[in-house]
């Protein structure tokens, strides 16, 4: 069972239509779930000092890397996933990420909205497949530099 479903059942959360959420709300939850995934991967890779773990995680969750992720997996997205990404990317954000261009920030917001939507629609396997694919493409690009 998906983590979202377990949380929903345990905490007796009401059923809501995910499409009623604003794209920035999807991005908010997507940011959190993506961070959990990245932290899980990094902690599993090596038992290191927490500050080194944090630095490694921060590099993968920053707006620029999230923008690279979505570009890496763009051709793998379904029409619906692409539409969710675009809703997030085009949302009018009040704030701007520190150390990020507006372009990267908006693109990353789209990526986070997609992650949030996949999580909230119990599509965690799909979410993980896209994250794995994106990370492997980014790593290959880094290695070829």
Predicted regions and their residues:
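Double-stranded RNA-binding/processing signature
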Residues: 1-145
């Amino acid at each position: 069972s998906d983590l979202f479903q377990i949380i929903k059942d345990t905490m007796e959360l009401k059923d809501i239509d995910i499409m009623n959420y604003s794209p920035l709300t999807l991005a908010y939850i997507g940011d959190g779930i993506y961070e959990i995934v990245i932290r899980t991967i990094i902690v599993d890779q090596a038992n290191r000092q927490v500050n080194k773990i944090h630095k490694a995680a921060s590099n993968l969750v920053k707006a620029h890397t999230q923008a690279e992720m979505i570009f890496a997996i763009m051709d793998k997205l379904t029409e619906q996933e692409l539409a969710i990404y675009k809703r997030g990317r085009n949302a009018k954000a009040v704030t701007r990420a520190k150390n990020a261009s507006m372009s990267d920030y908006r693109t990353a917001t789209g990526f986070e909205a997609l992650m949030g939507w996949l999580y909230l629609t119990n599509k965690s396997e799909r979410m993980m497949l896209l994250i794995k694919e994106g990370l492997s493409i980014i790593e290959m690009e880094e290695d070829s530099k």
